[in-house]
């Protein structure tokens, strides 16, 4: 097949971690915001701000909530949080919270606010902030699904049933999505809050449960898929890398390797979180690690692994590509299966399942198990940052 001429591997792709390239994570280049509460802040101000999230004053409302959860009136606690962020290496800017966060009659989280009690307000606001932070990574459509299908169960399990009332209306979610974007002050303040939360053992479990750690856009999912595919094919990882990496994917793969090496070399758990979150905290980092090319690698791996387990596609709902590339991915998968089947001469590493699938395919990938869906959606869930249509057309010419 013509597209096989475009395959080449990573053995000649040098990942020189000392070379710079502007891709290394440097926390000092990211300014995190920490909001302070005002001297006259009372419970009514907090509740009004909570109700206003998702409305026209979302930025102001979130600044009030973030100031509240950072305990800005407790000077010792406040200074401890600042110290944690600075020790990781971030630049920190202290900013007063907004004076007026009430959005009048437009209060998207009014139902949540109405259920809050004095003894639950802190946990409810933490849960709201964890949920809002996901808008950096997921688009509105995916957040609607998350809020409808997953948030209620998590909220109940962790004792904050008030979050079951989190709105799913597109207008409120679109407003949140427009405010919580890479490089925005409120976004950096959200992740400053999350980093401190995760640095504390007593809060780590709850933070993860409420999805603060859903950052698998860093490529960790692809690594798991790759390992599974190598095992299924009976291929050595180095050989599979050579077959899998098309010319236009190499830069993206290099970024993944660089990022994972930085994660593995981090000396503390806080620093590891900081590295993984780097693409959330700075617009330039976010675009540099926009791993849309890796969604295509993952689509190929899903096509291979789909021969073995129906769970492959169910566990990877976010990995979806254009119809053109989905077709190409299936043909690449067949080429890989045929190569390793023939190379083993029916011996070790040649699964009978693969043999049967290839014999019955007559050159086409048949069966729906593991088949990537045709509609396009980025692997990491970011909404419409960059169009990928041109890239897909470039790939399809190799079919």
Curated annotation (Swiss-Prot):
Keywords: Capsid protein, Helical capsid protein, Host cytoplasm, Phosphoprotein, Ribonucleoprotein, RNA-binding, Viral nucleoprotein, Virion
GO cellular component, one term: ribonucleoprotein complex
UniProt subcellular location: Virion; Host cytoplasm
Cited InterPro entries: Rhabdo_ncap_2
Biased composition regions of type Acidic residues, renumbered to the chain: 381-393
Positions of region (Disordered): 361-399
Classification via Pfam families: Rhabdo_ncap_2 (PF03216)
MF term (GO), any: RNA binding
Entry similarity comment: Belongs to the novirhabdovirus nucleocapsid protein family.
Its biological purpose: Encapsidates the genome, protecting it from nucleases. If expressed without protein P it binds non-specifically RNA and therefore can bind it's own mRNA. Interaction with protein P abolishes any non-specific RNA binding, and prevents phosphorylation. The soluble N-P complex encapsidates specifically the genomic RNA, with protein N protecting the genome like a pearl necklace. The encapsidated genomic RNA is termed the nucleocapsid (NC) and serves as template for viral transcription and replication. Protein N binds protein P in the NC through a different interaction, and can be phosphorylated.
Subunit record text: Homomultimerizes to form the nucleocapsid. Binds to viral genomic RNA.
Name of the featured protein: Nucleoprotein
